[in-house]
Regions:
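N-terminal auxiliary segments of SAM/dcSAM-dependent transferases
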Residues: 1-138
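SAM-dependent Rossmann-like transferase core, predominantly class I methyltransferases
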Residues: 102-175, 179-181, 185-189
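Conserved SAM/SAH cofactor-binding pocket of Class I
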Residues: 158-243, 249
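Mobile active-site "lid"/loop adjacent to the S-adenosyl-L-methionine
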Residues: 245-270
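A short glycine-rich, Lys/Arg-flanked "PGG" loop and its adjoining helix->strand segment in the class I
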Residues: 267-281
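Short alpha-helix
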Residues: 270-271, 296-312
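Conserved beta-strand signature within the Rossmann-like core of class I S-adenosyl-L-methionine
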Residues: 282-289
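Class I S-adenosyl-L-methionine
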Residues: 304-351
Length: 352
């Protein structure tokens, strides 16, 4: 570790970072932020390459391999940015000039800090950004209300999959499960639609706490029962079981990665293989998932259909919607062709 200050130039910081040297900042907080931004601009692959007018970003012929290389580049970028450290005093407080008050954001994310520590500046900025999401909330048209994600919980900024859940006709049932509830947004939609009893599960204690606060604030806390467990409530059945698993197979390296990447499709396959044992007679499962993995060559449609059949299930229906989020229409995205072709679907699954 090397102690550095405002005199450190970005090119020198990049050289130190690529050599594996961590830099403990002792200068001005805002100058540290500027240095972090400058360091990010120097990392190869940090920004899309400039193209001539009308030229689109296109991956190579093996889009799946391109995507994994892209993830590796982003992982390297994250490691290099994490080399800039800032000191924290107990509480915590950032022990630098012109530093913001971080006590509320840090305590909400990690609890009180009993002794001095050092943390990557980019991690601290992530904590502060997440706290703003928690305070302001995310507008969810399907609820006509807001959801307030906690640190480590995925913000439901894409509304199309929630619209599918809100608009699909409900089966005749009084009980539903929401598997992997996260912020509680799907459980809230089901409760608002008139399901008498919703059991929402998640393995993460952060998610359970986040969902509990959201459901109470939305006035459905007495309808939704939260259970911290892996996948299904043990020994229970419902007429409707909903699951919105992470959409891409791949390793999850951060808390937020866990909402996007499903290692070896574990959660998707666990939902399919366990669904029959947790459906009431006449019940159905709703699998809410994007086909982006198929567009990227990470999974085939035949694989998904094979897993459904192997689980003793059949597809009773499917409702599709085309995403309209920013990255779906961004020609500078390195995977624009895949993202622009993406479809999000609600698969209705019943016993075969």
């Amino acid at each position: 570790m090397q102690v550095v200050d405002d005199t450190l130039k970005a090119e020198d910081a990049y050289r130190l970072a690529t050599r594996g040297t961590t830099m403990l900042w002792s200068g001005d907080y805002h100058n540290a932020r500027q240095l972090l931004s400058a360091l990010g601009r120097r990392i190869p692959g940090a920004r899309p390459a400039k193209r001539s007018a009308g030229q689109k970003a296109e991956p190579g012929p093996d889009v799946g391999a391109d995507f994994y290389r892209h993830r590796q580049a982003r992982s390297r970028r994250s490691r290099l940015l994490a080399s800039i450290l800032v000191p924290l005093a107990p509480g915590p407080a950032v022990d630098l000039r012109r530093a913001p008050d971080i006590a509320q954001a840090w305590t909400h994310a990690h609890g009180r800090l009993p002794e001095a520590a050092v943390v990557p500046l980019q991690d601290l900025l992530g904590v502060l950004g997440a706290d703003q999401w928690r305070i302001r909330g995310v507008s969810v048209p399907a609820l006509q209300d807001t959801i307030h994600p906690h640190y480590g919980a995925f913000a439901p900024v894409r509304g199309e999959y929630l619209d599918l859940v809100a608009e699909q006709p409900l089966p005749e049932t009084t009980t539903a499960f929401d598997i992997g509830t996260g912020t509680g947004v799907i459980a809230a939609i089901l409760a608002r639609r008139g399901i008498n009893h919703v059991i929402a599960t998640d393995l993460s204690d952060r998610a359970i706490a986040c969902a509990g606060e959201n459901l109470a604030r939305l006035g459905v806390g007495d309808i939704v029962e939260l259970e911290q467990t892996d996948m299904f409530p043990a020994g229970r059945r419902a007429g409707l079981v909903v699951c919105n698993p992470p959409w891409l197979p791949g390793s999850a390296n951060t808390l937020l990665d866990q909402a996007v990447y499903d290692p070896k499709s574990r959660m998707l396959r666990a939902f399919l293989t366990g669904l029959l044992a947790h459906l009431e007679p006449g019940g159905e499962g709703w699998l809410v998932i994007s086909d982006l993995a198929e567009q990227l060559g990470l999974r085939s449609r035949d694989e998904l259909l094979g897993w459904i059949a192997d689980a003793g299930l059949r597809v009773a229906g499917r409702r599709d919607v085309k995403p309209t989020h920013r990255r779906a229409v961004d020609p500078d995205d390195p995977f624009h062709s895949a993202r622009s072709a993406e479809i999000t679907s609600l698969w209705r699954l019943t016993p075969a």
